[in-house]
């Protein structure tokens, strides 16, 4: 695990860490942490703003100046278990880490079922099972799943969706810049070579038919 941390202008601690980096062609580990930290600071600003806005908060005042976020790896195949498919976490506030299990449960359920955790909570509880989390929604933006926790269910959903959207947009911008730097190559890799997985898929083939 690698990570980074800082304090927001409003005084909220922001800590991020990633477990997987499927975008190594695009971002070093330190750069991925820096991106998560940048996006975490945006969420910290929103959390503080909505926590202190009182009746002016568009989705109601946030009850706590803290949150925990879990991002899943959008590139991970369905055969990879949830505990190995976590891309990283974003923790806001002194006790934001206490909400990571809730966020993980939402994100993990969403990945397993292929839909918002809240649907299972409210409509299909037979799909949850022992040890599942009883509250809240998860968000998915163009395949990027995020679970978030510590506010109301709707507030958690909004914040998860914002983080997912920001992450997808940031990766898209960096990917386009990478394409312009590299030109018309075939593979998303520093040496323009396929991943070992794709080589392994055809290792059994010995050559052209005679």
Please provide the spans of the model-predicted regions:
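Structured interaction and signal-relay segments at domain junctions
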Residues: 48-125
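Juxtadomain coupling helices with adjacent low-complexity linkers
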Residues: 11-54, 143-210
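Sensory/regulatory domains in signal-transduction proteins
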Residues: 115-162
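Compositionally biased, low-complexity repeat tracts
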Residues: 7, 56, 84, 89, ...
């Amino acid at each position: 695990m690698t990570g980074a941390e800082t304090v927001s202008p409003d005084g909220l601690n922001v800590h991020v860490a990633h477990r997987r980096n499927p975008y190594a062609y695009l971002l070093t580990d330190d750069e991925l942490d820096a991106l998560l930290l940048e996006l975490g600071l945006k969420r910290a600003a929103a959390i503080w703003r909505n926590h202190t806005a009182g009746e002016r908060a568009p989705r109601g005042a946030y009850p706590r100046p803290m949150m925990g976020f879990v991002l899943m790896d959008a590139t991970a195949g369905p055969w990879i278990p949830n505990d190995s498919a976590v891309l990283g976490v974003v923790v806001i506030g002194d006790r934001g880490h206490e909400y990571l299990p809730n966020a993980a449960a939402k994100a993990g359920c969403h990945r397993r079922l292929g839909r918002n955790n809240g649907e299972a909570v409210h409509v299909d509880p037979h799909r949850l099972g022992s040890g599942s989390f009883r509250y809240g929604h998860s968000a998915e933006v163009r395949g990027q799943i995020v679970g978030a926790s510590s506010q109301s269910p709707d507030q958690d959903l909004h914040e998860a969706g914002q983080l997912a959207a920001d992450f997808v947009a940031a990766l898209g911008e960096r990917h386009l810049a990478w394409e312009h730097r590299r030109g018309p190559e075939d593979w998303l890799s520093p040496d323009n070579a396929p991943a070992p997985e794709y080589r392994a898929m055809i290792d059994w083939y010995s050559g052209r038919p005679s």
